[in-house]
Structures are given as structure tokens and as C-alpha cells.
């Protein structure tokens, strides 16, 4: 495979994503490519895309194309909250995630942990649109009702687990690619049930939106493996959330920092 440069990747993305009413802006300092359509903007980090391309080839670019196209489609999608309560879900994002749209509309959001925030989304099938506070006023629906619908729908989602083990430490993965894998972190009944099944310390990670990792950690090797795993997923994710795992104790999630071969204090 020929070496992919920043310029080559920029040109390929522009070619693949070219469409009417769509503009491109390249930031040389940050190596980012911004795509704007009808007032909506998506920004891509080219070095990250190149790294994924070197691992996965054209599949990495296809994922980016899909992500951008679905994002613009979601932004233009019509949302009717009151008659479609079953389409409302909570989604987890980093605390640094913007709380306003580019047009100044404030997104409906709740605090969660020091590393994560809860937003609310309207499912559009292959993508979703974040719910804006102004939508609630237009449809005469409250924040409490949105929360109730969202968490009721979350509780109905299947949670298939794939297990892997390293030196007596078990790791469970949720990767359905339905857009709500990280959201399963908010399912309190699921977390409680998992805590009862595990014998070691329960540590969870949501490095990006399409994966939830649960570790049954028995020793320092387990923490080390989880730390490396979380960083790898965080670097590869289209929508990164946090590289810090969480310890689950007494129904609460506390972020921790793990160094190789050692577990640091919370």
C-alpha cells in the first residue's frame, strides 16, 4: 500500500464527499478538514484518518464517508418528539462536547461524571439527531419526560457480551454498532447485575460511542491491559469519548487514571 500523505488524504476525502451546496476548508495548522452544508459543519482530523487507513485500508475511508453523510442527513431530518417517544435515547459524550449547535441552539444535556455528559438524541434509523432545548418548547414536552422516555428505551436494548480473558482477568465487550453501545453505561440495572456476577473490581470504559468495555480486574496486569485497550479504542473511534476508565462501586462511577503496571489512586 502506497504511503498516504496528509495532502493525498485531503484530496481523496474532498473527491469522495463532493456534493452540491457543500464547502470544504482545510486548516493546515491543525491538519483538519471541515465540511459545511446548509449551515451544518463536520470537522475531520486527517492524521487520525490516515492512522486508521494504514490499519484498515479503504474500509477506514468508507466509514468516514458514511459518518459524514449520515451526519448531514441527521442534521436535516425532521423531528417530532411527542408522537415518537420510542425514538428517544440517551447518548454519552465527553464533557468537552459542544452544548450548542453551530447556529446557537442549546442541546438538551445532563451532567454525568467528571469525564462524561449525557445528551439526548432522536433516532433516525441509521443515524440520530441531538435534541435541542427549543424542540421541547415547540412540542410542549418537558425535560423530565424526555429523560423518562430515553431511559425506558435504553432499558429495552439488548446487551450482547463478548468475553476475552488475559491472565485471569476477564473483559466483556458491547459492540452492536447501533449507535448506543456507550449508552449502555447508563443502564443502572445492567451495571448492578454485572457487579453481582464479577469477582474482582468492576472497571468500565467508554473510549468511543461504539464500544463499552467491562473489566473484571483481579490484579495489576488487568489494569494494565485495560489501560492499553482503552487507549487503542479511543484513538480509533470516530466519536471519541474518554480514555479514562471508571471504577464502579456502590452504584457510582468514578474515573481513575491507570499507568502501565500500576493502578493509581482515584
Swiss-Prot record:
Superkingdom assignment: Bacteria
InterPro entries, per the entry: DUF1444
HAMAP family: UPF0354
Family named by the database record: Belongs to the UPF0354 family.
Name of the molecule in the record: UPF0354 protein lwe1624
Amino acid at each position: 500500500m502506497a504511503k498516504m500523505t496528509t495532502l493525498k488524504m485531503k484530496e481523496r476525502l474532498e473527491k469522495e464527499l463532493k456534493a452540491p451546496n457543500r464547502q470544504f476548508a482545510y486548516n493546515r495548522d491543525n491538519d483538519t478538514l471541515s465540511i459545511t452544508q446548509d449551515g451544518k459543519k463536520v470537522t475531520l482530523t486527517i492524521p487520525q484518518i490516515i492512522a486508521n487507513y494504514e490499519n484498515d485500508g479503504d474500509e477506514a475511508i468508507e466509514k468516514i464517508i458514511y459518518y459524514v453523510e449520515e451526519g448531514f442527513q441527521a442534521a436535516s431530518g425532521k423531528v417530532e418528539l411527542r408522537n415518537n417517544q420510542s425514538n428517544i435515547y440517551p447518548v454519552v459524550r465527553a464533557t468537552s462536547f459542544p452544548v450548542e449547535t453551530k447556529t446557537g441552539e442549546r442541546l438538551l444535556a445532563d451532567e454525568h461524571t467528571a469525564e462524561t455528559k449525557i445528551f439526548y438524541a432522536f433516532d433516525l434509523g441509521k443515524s440520530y439527531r441531538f435534541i435541542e432545548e427549543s424542540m421541547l418548547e415547540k412540542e410542549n414536552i418537558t425535560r423530565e419526560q424526555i429523560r423518562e422516555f430515553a431511559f425506558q428505551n435504553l432499558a429495552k436494548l439488548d446487551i450482547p457480551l463478548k468475553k476475552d480473558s488475559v491472565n485471569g482477568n476477564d473483559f466483556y465487550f458491547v459492540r452492536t454498532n447501533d449507535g448506543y453501545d456507550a449508552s449502555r453505561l447508563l443502564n443502572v440495572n445492567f451495571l448492578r447485575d454485572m457487579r453481582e456476577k464479577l469477582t474482582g473490581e468492576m472497571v468500565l470504559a467508554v473510549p468511543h460511542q461504539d464500544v463499552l468495555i467491562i473489566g473484571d480486574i483481579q490484579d495489576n496486569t488487568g489494569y494494565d491491559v485495560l489501560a492499553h485497550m482503552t487507549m487503542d479504542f479511543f484513538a480509533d473511534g470516530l466519536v471519541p469519548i474518554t480514555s479514562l476508565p471508571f471504577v464502579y462501586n456502590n452504584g457510582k462511577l468514578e474515573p481513575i487514571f491507570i499507568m502501565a503496571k500500576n493502578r493509581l489512586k482515584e
